Amino acid sequence: MDELVIAGRSFSSRLMVGTGKFASNSLMADALAASGSQIVTVALRRVDIDRPEDDLLAHIDRDKYLLLPNTSGARDAEEAVRLARLARAAGCEPWVKLEVTPDPYYLLPDPIETLKAAEILVKEGFVVLPYINADPVLAKHLQEAGTATVMPLGAPIGTNKGVRTRDNIAIIIEQAIVPVVVDAGLGAPSHVAEAMEMGADAVLVNTALAVTPDPAGMAHAFRLGVEAGRRAFLAGLPAQQQKAEASSPLTGFLRDEQ
């Protein structure tokens, strides 16, 4: 399968994985391995980046995975920027998944504060991957600001509802000049396959892997879903049509039709 390229860096996997909600860190580590992922997101508020022996970080091989700190929990641009700076000061690579979610109930991203934070972080040399509503206009503004990707939500975080924002994501993909990563709400392998079939460059999944009784098994299923969807997109899906069209001749063997 072709490689994903973000900010000049190549990845063989198009499945990114989050580390929250797992029943144990060993289950999380097994899921990461089964997923084939190379990019792993970690909420900065959940770990002590300064301490590699932190139990969560001890289960993530930093030579194998790109550790992508995220600013989950930030309510405005100021908090998000502060979290990103703390991660870089602690020795993390200057990559950040930018999340600004002032509403703790629906966890929908704040477009104004997200754009504001992105502009600051890009100027400071960060590789910024912003989590956003599926808003094509905002996506264009973020790309113009210099973000490395845009990450529109399929559905609200943790809802497992799938690609509910399909029409807007299709517009974002059509207009994108950076990779489009569908993030949030993807609860089944069929959901990630759908996103990849649409032409998304990658997907990010967490809850669907963490809450299942078999995280590693589900991670492997999602891996296959991503690969199937990407291969289908590259091969070229047939156009949909209203009228039926037979795949084999209907005449000439039972009767002749004029």
From Swiss-Prot:
Which reaction equation describes what this protein catalyses? [ThiS sulfur-carrier protein]-C-terminal-Gly-aminoethanethioate + 2-iminoacetate + 1-deoxy-D-xylulose 5-phosphate = [ThiS sulfur-carrier protein]-C-terminal Gly-Gly + 2-[(2R,5Z)-2-carboxy-4-methylthiazol-5(2H)-ylidene]ethyl phosphate + 2 H2O + H(+)
Assembly with partners or alone:
Homotetramer. Forms heterodimers with either ThiH or ThiS.
Name the active site residues.
97 (schiff-base intermediate with dxp)
Which purpose does this protein serve, as stated in its record?
Answer: Catalyzes the rearrangement of 1-deoxy-D-xylulose 5-phosphate (DXP) to produce the thiazole phosphate moiety of thiamine. Sulfur is provided by the thiocarboxylate moiety of the carrier protein ThiS. In vitro, sulfur can be provided by H(2)S.
Location(s) in or outside the cell: Cytoplasm
**Listed InterPro entries:** Aldolase_TIM (IPR013785), Thiazole_synthase_ThiG (IPR033983), ThiG (IPR008867)
Enzyme class name: transferase
The family note in this entry says: Belongs to the ThiG family.
Residues that hold 1-deoxy-D-xylulose 5-phosphate according to the record: 158, 184-185, 206-207
One Gene Ontology biological process: thiamine diphosphate biosynthetic process
What the entry lists under Gene3D superfamilies is as follows: Aldolase class I
Q: Which Gene Ontology cellular component annotation is one that this UniProt entry carries?
A: cytoplasm
Which protein are we looking at?
A: Thiazole synthase 2
